[in-house]
């Protein structure tokens, strides 16, 4: 997922080393997340991780029209391992954000990206990603995430 520069130049950049370290730690943090990462690494679809542009937050890029039709595809994760805050400015261990985006990549890889919203407008795909990140939050000691863009996630949907 992160080796294109090494293949071209013959060495890893600091960014690549940091991302690889975060991926390895995620594999150790949670067995299910580790299996998800291995599935993405072995996928016939191409998934890559690139540095988030300055001033932007972590994100996953993919073809939304294909996703709405449940067509499996690759993705591009935008991730900055040096950003230690979430979108609201609260402290967050960086790999928590990576786990969230990896869940989106896994969903599009399998063709199961949900565009269904729950009653208060939160997309189910975000609840899935938040449940994934909460597994890592438990390991890092970061507070459990219970909201999405200021809206409370119903407790029954949180793992």
PLM regions and their residue ranges:
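Catalytic toxin/effector domains delivered as secreted proteins or via bacterial secretion systems
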Residues: 2-159
């Amino acid at each position: 997922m992160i080796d294109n520069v090494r293949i071209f130049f013959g060495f890893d950049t600091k960014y690549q080393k940091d991302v690889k370290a975060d991926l390895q730690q995620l594999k150790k943090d949670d067995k299910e997340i580790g299996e998800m990462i291995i599935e993405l690494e072995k996928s016939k679809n191409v998934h890559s991780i690139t540095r988030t542009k300055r001033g932007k937050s972590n994100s996953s890029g993919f073809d939304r029209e294909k996703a709405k039709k449940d067509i499996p595809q690759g993705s591009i994760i935008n991730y900055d391992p040096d950003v230690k805050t979430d979108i609201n400015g609260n402290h967050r261990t960086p790999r928590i954000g990576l786990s969230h985006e990896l869940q989106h990549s896994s969903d599009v890889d399998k063709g199961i990206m949900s565009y269904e919203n729950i009653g208060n407008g939160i997309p189910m795909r975000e609840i899935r990603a938040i449940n994934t990140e909460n597994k890592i939050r438990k390991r890092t000691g970061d507070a459990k995430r219970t909201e999405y863009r200021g809206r409370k996630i119903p407790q029954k949907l949180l793992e």
